[in-house]
Amino acid sequence: DDKIANLNAASAALSRKDTLLAEKYLKRAETSTPEYENAVGVLHLLRGDYEQAKLHLNKAAESGLKQANLNLEELAKKEENIELMSKLDY
């Protein structure tokens, strides 16, 4: 059971938005890397748990992972859209 291979498989599943499979692989992945924190952040982002997403993505970004910064930008856009939608009167 290769922990790096599991992390790569989780990332591939996340790119397909397959959160169930990604979670399965993340449970067997190397957890002490910025790439792991980024993947967990993306998992939470896709599931709509923005607080947990921000926590994990910030950890990855603080470790210097550029992709985490891009994912944080995506998270900020989603939060901004939610705020705008909440201001609309239907």
Description of each model-found segment:
Residues D1, S32-T33, G64-L65:
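Short helix-capping/linker turns of helical repeat alpha-solenoids
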